[in-house]
């Protein structure tokens, strides 16, 4: 694909298909797409060179995904069979002499838009490709609320955006306390993202007899290297708040066994706030196969953390020394201590003492498995595959890899194919009981090892010292929930590639969201679990949840969910639909009631082509707006909007009219309104009607008449500006059906409060205010011809004498000369609109009528 030849729309389409940001100029879009294309190259082109120094850390390839995107994983090459010794005991190189992570594309970790560079004390290098991806990536929440990226998790440099973009981001959304996880789930469901095509996870021909990190018994956001002895967590966006755990594939229940773990890197997470406690920490230890990945936070899960504390069942106690990057922790399990099992640890070869004593009877003969829980750290294990250990081992202990296979207990093996996997999609309103049912169902089916995909499960992995982050969290709670929702969207995309069993714990009331979320899981056993309690039970559960967790979902969001609630049906994307409480018939009736309730309480449907305003200045916000399809703007808008500048037909009040093809307002038929530019019922200055009129051939004007011997007495001033009987401008045209051929003046009266533009009374057809116009210059050759438009036939006109009661000083000749210049300029300006004025012959104007002569 030649990125340079793609158009902007094509670039955005390609970026959207890959789940990348589609905002920016064409150059930025092209750079972003080029980076994504390079990231899709095979792994053998993206690995480190084989001549890397032994012991030097290689690249950590992290994935680059945006919301709605898919995980870009390459093809994993199987490691050579058997155990391969490393080049150096203290090195961090893989079996091939270099460290190549699990065919995963790089993860964007930074939000710095000026200097996108990771500071790495351990020497982890980043190639230009990663920098291009980091520069191309902009965190965003493209939602119906149009809410921008949160800034509280960004470094100060991230706010230094380009000026041309920053000026459009000055308006801030109001902060609402009641935006919890349910609200952001609802907002995501409203979004109409295109589903990503399902992708198969490449199979590895890994030797299953080796002790290694179990890719089935680890978190989805823990990335395992191809040699299965090292790994690291995702750290972009909200993932930096999450713990990420993994267990080994084999456990033990007898003997004296050990393994080692080394912290290779504390991954930079500059986007975390400075108030985040312990942004880099590792917890290492043992657990049962039935335990979750949250080491040390439940029974039979024992861990020793880098904060110098040991923990089990979320009880933390001081133990040993703190440890950090480049430290090596040895883990020892002694099953030969009578009726107890003793667990102890070493730091860099120094024994920390016995940490836990467990009764064998309590274990019930179950095996303990090596377990690690990390937060923004890359780690590597030594299960015995290395020729030499990192540090000295306590006497009498054996690496778990060196035990006979018969003495090792294999952990739970995952499904062999996607046909054996289940995806259960919860469907129900907030507080209906979806999470409660999911937890109970997973606990009652431990062999399936359900992965619950929900914001609540994400928040459980953000614990601090084993405690959930509550609303007294130092930062913005709604922003943290928003980050968790982003993580969930990414995990759903990753989950579609992994052969596991899942429970999708979200509302999923939108039919479009149901289809979109199930399509990537093609090949799974896709089932919908509908929880629809009675309306009374739902209200009680909502009150209880609000008391426990606070207001989670705004009322308007719940009403919108009710209005769009769609019960799923067995079809293309669902194999089975189960109703937990109300069954199908009762649920259908209740959902129809919810639909009606939501539609009545919700706002009216949005109209894409609507004119809502009337009366804005010069029509920028009034007179109908920028609408090509409807002319519903009420009269009164000043100048109207595009294609509707004339306002209502014949209505008064529109200033200067506009270009109205419908003929509304003034200047209709004969272009001047009802033959009188100052007519009461026409718009002041009217609107220009483009519609050509079928007119007879223009007639030759009669010869000019001699002026009257005596001018009329000067009129007097009146607040009405145009007093009754005052002479007004009348441009006559030979138009069938009009009164243009009669020279009867019409009276124009404007009240002072009306925002109209009236001028001192004068007759543009003949200045009859008591002066003799100078001889006009010869008119230029006509430059415009309206074709079928009727020509002007200014008939001789003698204005009637004004009322005697109206007297005011005689206007001077200079005033009339100034008016003449203004009108001449006015008609010259009309020539700047050839699309609207065609080839009309305006003639020249210099103290006389257009095409006629002045009279007195």
Swiss-Prot record:
Residues 668-693, 742-764, 784-795 have a biased composition (Low complexity). There is a cross-link at residues 117, 142, 146, 162, 270, 449, 539 (Glycyl lysine isopeptide (Lys-Gly) (interchain with G-Cter in SUMO2)). Residues 213-856 are annotated as: Necessary for interaction with TP53. Its main location: nucleus. GO terms for molecular function: enzyme binding; RNA binding. Residues 191-388 form the B30.2/SPRY domain. SMART domains: SAP, SPRY. The modification Phosphoserine is found at residues 194, 512, 718. Residues 612-626, 634-667 have a biased composition (Gly residues). Residues 456-594 are annotated as: Necessary for interaction with BRD7 and transcriptional activation. The modification Omega-N-methylarginine is found at residues 645, 656, 661, 671. The modification Phosphothreonine is found at residue 209. SUPFAM superfamilies: Concanavalin A-like lectins/glucanases (SSF49899), P-loop containing nucleoside triphosphate hydrolases (SSF52540), SAP domain (SSF68906). Pfam families: AAA_33, SAP, SPRY. InterPro entries: B30.2/SPRY, B30.2/SPRY_sf, ConA-like_dom_sf, P-loop_NTPase, SAP_dom, SAP_dom_sf, SPRY_dom, SPRY_hnRNP_U. Residues 1-103 are annotated as: Necessary for interaction with HRMT1L1. Methylated. Residues 3-37 form the SAP domain. It comes from the Eukaryota. One of its GO terms (biological process) is alternative mRNA splicing, via spliceosome. Residues 104-117, 725-741 have a biased composition (Polar residues). It is found in: Nucleus. The RGG-box domain is methylated. This is Heterogeneous nuclear ribonucleoprotein U-like protein 1.
């Amino acid at each position: 694909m030649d990125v340079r030849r793609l158009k902007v729309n094509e670039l955005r389409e390609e970026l959207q298909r890959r789940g990348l940001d589609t905002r920016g100029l064409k150059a930025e879009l092209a750079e972003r797409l080029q980076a994504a294309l390079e990231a899709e190259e095979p792994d053998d082109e993206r690995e480190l060179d084989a001549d890397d120094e032994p012991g030097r850390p290689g690249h950590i390839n992290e994935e680059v995904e945006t919301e709605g995107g898919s995980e870009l994983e390459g093809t994993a090459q199987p490691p050579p069979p058997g155990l391969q010794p490393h080049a150096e005991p203290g090195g961090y190189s893989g079996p091939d002499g270099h460290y190549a992570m699990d065919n995963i594309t790089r993860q964007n970790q930074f939000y710095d838009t000026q200097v996108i560079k990771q500071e790495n004390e351990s020497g982890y290098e980043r190639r230009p490709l990663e920098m291009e991806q980091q520069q191309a990536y902009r965190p965003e929440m493209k939602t119906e609320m149009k809410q921008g990226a949160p800034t509280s998790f960004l470094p100060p440099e991230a706010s230094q955006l380009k000026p041309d973009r920053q000026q459009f981001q000055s308006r801030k959304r109001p902060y609402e306390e009641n935006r919890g996880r349910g609200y952001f789930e609802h907002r995501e469901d409203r979004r109409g993202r295109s589903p990503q095509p399902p992708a198969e996870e490449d199979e590895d021909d890994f030797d299953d007899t080796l002790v290694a990190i179990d890719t089935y018994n680890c978190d989805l956001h823990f990335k395992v290297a191809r040699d299965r002895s090292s790994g690291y967590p995702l750290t972009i966006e909200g993932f930096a708040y999450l713990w990420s755990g993994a267990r080994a594939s084999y456990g033990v229940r007898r003997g004296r066994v050990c393994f080692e773990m080394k912290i290779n890197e504390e991954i930079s997470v500059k986007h975390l706030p400075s108030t985040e406690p312990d942004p880099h920490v590792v917890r290492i230890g043992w657990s049962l196969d039935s335990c979750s990945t949250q080491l040390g936070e439940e029974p039979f899960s024992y861990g020793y953390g880098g904060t110098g504390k040991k923990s089990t069942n979320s009880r933390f106690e001081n133990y040993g020394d703190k440890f950090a990057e480049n430290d090596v922790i040895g883990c020892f399990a002694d099953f030969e201590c009578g009726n107890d099992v003793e667990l102890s640890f070493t730091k860099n070869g120094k024994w920390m003492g016995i940490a836990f004593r467990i009764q064998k009877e309590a274990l019930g003969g179950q095996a303990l498995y090596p377990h690690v829980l990390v937060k923004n750290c890359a780690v590597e294990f030594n299960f015995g595959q290395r020729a030499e250990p990192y540090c000295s081992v306590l006497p009498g202990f054996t690496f778990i890899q060196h035990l006979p296979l018969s003495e090792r207990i294999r952990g739970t093996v995952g499904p062999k194919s996607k046909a054996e996997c289940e995806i259960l999609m919860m469907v129900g309103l907030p507080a209906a009981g979806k999470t409660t049912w999911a937890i109970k169902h997973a606990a009652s089916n431990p062999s399936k090892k359900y992965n619950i995909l929900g914001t609540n499960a994400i928040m459980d992995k953000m614990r601090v010292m084993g405690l959930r982050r509550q609303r007294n969290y130092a930062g913005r709670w709604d922003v943290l929930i928003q980050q968790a929702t982003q993580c969930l969207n990414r995990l759903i995309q990753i989950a579609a590639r992994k052969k596991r069993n899942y429970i999708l714990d979200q509302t999923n009331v939108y039919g479009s969201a149901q289809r979109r979320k199930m399509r990537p899981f093609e090949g799974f056993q896709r089932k919908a679990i509908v929880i629809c309690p009675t309306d009374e039970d739902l209200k009680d559960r909502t009150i209880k949840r609000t008391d426990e967790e606070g207001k989670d979902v705004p009322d308007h969001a719940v009403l919108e969910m009710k209005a769009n609630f769609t019960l799923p049906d067995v079809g293309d994307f669902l194999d089975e639909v189960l109703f937990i409480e109300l069954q199908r018939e009762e649920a259908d009736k209740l959902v129809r009631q919810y639909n009606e309730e939501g539609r009545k309480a919700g706002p009216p449907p949005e109209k894409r082509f609507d004119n809502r305003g009337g009366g804005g200045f010069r029509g920028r916000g009034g007179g109908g707006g920028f609408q090509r399809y409807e002319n519903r703007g009420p009269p009164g808008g000043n100048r109207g909007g595009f294609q509707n500048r004339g306002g209502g037909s014949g209505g008064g009040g529109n200033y200067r009219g506009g270009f109205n093809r419908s003929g509304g307002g003034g200047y209709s038929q004969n272009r001047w309104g009802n033959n009188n530019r100052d007519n009461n019922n026409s718009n002041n200055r009217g609107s220009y009607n483009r519609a050509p009129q079928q007119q007879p051939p223009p007639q030759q004007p009669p010869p000019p008449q001699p002026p009257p011997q005596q001018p009329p007495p000067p009129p007097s001033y009146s607040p009405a500006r145009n007093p009754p009987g005052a002479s007004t401008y009348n441009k006559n045209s030979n138009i069938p059906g009009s009164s243009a051929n009669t020279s009867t003046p019409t009276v124009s009266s404007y009240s002072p409060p009306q925002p109209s533009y009236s001028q001192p009374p004068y007759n543009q057809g003949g200045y009859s205010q008591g002066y003799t116009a100078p001889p006009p210059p010869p008119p230029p050759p006509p430059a415009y011809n309206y074709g079928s438009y009727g020509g002007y036939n200014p008939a001789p006109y003698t204005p009637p004498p004004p009322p005697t009661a109206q007297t005011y000083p005689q206007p001077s000749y200079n005033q009339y000369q100034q008016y003449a210049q203004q009108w001449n300029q006015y008609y010259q300006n009309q020539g700047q609109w050839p699309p609207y004025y065609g080839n009309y012959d305006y003639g020249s104007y210099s103290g006389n009528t257009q095409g006629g002569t002045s009279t007195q």
